[in-house]
Amino acid sequence: MQKLESRGFILFNRNYRENDKLVKIFTKQAGKRMFFVRGGGSGKLSAVIQPLNIAEFMMTVNDEGLSFIEDYSQAESFKEITSDIFKLSYATYLAALTDAAIADGVVDAQLFAFLEKTLVLMEEGLDYEILTNIFEIQVLDRFGVRLNFHECVFCHRVGLPFDFSYKFSGLLCPNHYEEDERRSHLDPNVPYLLDRFQGLSFEELRSISVKDEMKRKLRQFIDELYDNYVGIHLKSKKFIDNLNSWGHIMSKEDNAD
């Protein structure tokens, strides 16, 4: 058991017994921990323990069992995200993906900073779909998946119209397409963008602009990568998959009003 002060991100909370809450917090100093909050639905902590909030927490951290929040300060929320069903859905997915990417108790300050900055940019109005794609690609290594979208897996040439091979877990240049008759037949811009996504700085994110058709192709291929190499199926991702169809219906109804 140790007393600790750390910045923390609320991943989720759930009811526990009658009036209490269990709260999963990704802390910068102690990794992901489950916290017990007595009277969580109506007590002092009720506002700060809502998903996607960030604060400085004073806490008691236990290596085994539940940890406890003693106090908090500097609470922040993402008002633009939580007021938009689309942004909220994507942000919730990023939180769930973060939860899946590392084990509880593993300190990962770099991932914490990346998640926080991604949500800050989403809050500022940057493209939430592309921000999500970039996050998905850069977090792959947390699942033990390391893919090279920069060069041909055979001759290591760069800057060519590449395709992806699951057989070789890498790119094929035109001279080596025949090495895999079941290659992906991608639009060459897909691996080009994924190569950029792997190394983008936060400032470069502000200048990224991708057309809708290319977004669709990126979404399809990244889904295939996760199916083939990661194998997780998150409820929040399934919700996003259905979002465009019923979201379009909602939009039509709003226009009718």
UniProtKB/Swiss-Prot annotation:
Pfam family, one: RecO_C
Keyword Ligase: no
Cysteines engaged in disulfide bonds, as pairs: none
Record's protein name: DNA repair protein RecO
Keyword DNA repair: yes
Keyword annotations: DNA damage, DNA recombination, DNA repair
BP term (GO), one: DNA recombination
Organism per entry: Streptococcus thermophilus (strain ATCC BAA-250 / LMG 18311)
Family: Belongs to the RecO family.
Summary of the function given for this chain in its UniProt record: Involved in DNA repair and RecF pathway recombination.
Cellular component terms per the entry's GO annotation: bacterial nucleoid
